[in-house]
Amino acid sequence: MGHEGGTEWVRLIVGLVIILAFSQLNALFLVWLERKVAGRIQLRPGPMEVGPHGLLQTIMDGIKLVGKELITPRSVDRKLFILAPVLVFMPVLVGFLVLPFGPGLILRDMNVGILLIFSFSTFTVLAILAGGWASNNKYALLGAIRSVGQNVAYEIPLLLTVMSVVLMVNSMRFSEIVAAQGRVWFIFLQPVAGLLYLICATAETNRAPFDIPEAESELVAGFHTEYTGMRFGLFFLAEYTNMFIVTAVATSLFFGGWHGPFGFDFGLPGVVWFLIKTYVLIFVIMWVRWTFPRIRFDQLMNFSWKFLIPVSLVNLVVTAVVLKLIDLN
């Protein structure tokens, strides 16, 4: 019993180290990818100077960021100001614990995996609010308040769309949800829920056209206006890591997880299929960011409360009724 417990602890520690390393490398790659996507959309090549096709540009920028001075303004709440970037980044990492990268490639296959991810995502918003308030800056505080309002508005339809999938599988365990999509992905059975999830996930990650909390033309840099160096870098790491998490969840819920299309894997390992789908969804979010203009805050709120929430609620009710009729037959 003791030997098994020790092995489990070693497995957990190794998994946490891998998660931490992957999250850093993944964020570096996504920054480079976004620069390239933005460049292509704007008819330019993007960064090309450092490394082949600019691959090392992000690494050099990271080294430069680490060397930047950590400035703490006199008027801030010092302890909360320093703690906020860490509090933003840490809850995002929890999502990696329950993500099903492949058959058996789940660090913790919990029966409340979905609930865990969305519960901890709330802490990120609280950390953003703490950082905005502690900065003692009107732009930072206004950006943080906008972030809270946006999160509340879009968390509701996001959870309603997820519940539509949970009803179909009768489980919150990611492995069971992915296993149920061995032949047909849920995006074909729940197209409305899948589309709503992607819209809400884009808003949850504060990406354009929903980047109201960081609107440069209005709020300088939003809630991280006063941050410099790696404190500023942690906010960016959290943003890109969170973008990976929400798209990985979309892959698990709607796009078959580690399964290939219609049950055919074409000889590729499950983890490869999982990453391909996740990065394709990330590309779509980046494409939307660099294609559509930012909407106003009142438009953002109206879109959620008057359209997304009613539609997602109707979709959930229809799903429940259809499943009940199937059971009766």
Swiss-Prot record:
GO terms for biological process: aerobic respiration. Its EC number is 7.1.1.-. GO terms for molecular function: NADH dehydrogenase activity; oxidoreductase activity, acting on NAD(P)H, quinone or similar compound as acceptor; quinone binding. Its main location: membrane. Coiled coil: none annotated. It is a multi-pass membrane protein. It is an enzyme of class 7 (translocase). Keywords: Cell inner membrane, Cell membrane, Membrane, NAD, Quinone, Translocase, Transmembrane, Transmembrane helix, Ubiquinone. It catalyses: a quinone + NADH + 5 H(+)(in) = a quinol + NAD(+) + 4 H(+)(out). The chain crosses the membrane at residues 12-32, 81-101, 112-132, 152-172, 184-204, 244-264, 268-288, 303-323. GO terms for cellular component: plasma membrane. It holds the Pfam family NADHdh. It is found in: Cell inner membrane. Signal peptide: none annotated. The keyword Membrane applies. NDH-1 shuttles electrons from NADH, via FMN and iron-sulfur (Fe-S) centers, to quinones in the respiratory chain. The immediate electron acceptor for the enzyme in this species is believed to be ubiquinone. Couples the redox reaction to proton translocation (for every two electrons transferred, four hydrogen ions are translocated across the cytoplasmic membrane), and thus conserves the redox energy in a proton gradient. This subunit may bind ubiquinone. Belongs to the complex I subunit 1 family. NDH-1 is composed of 14 different subunits. Subunits NuoA, H, J, K, L, M, N constitute the membrane sector of the complex. This is NADH-quinone oxidoreductase subunit H 1. It comes from Syntrophobacter fumaroxidans (strain DSM 10017 / MPOB). The gene is nuoH1.
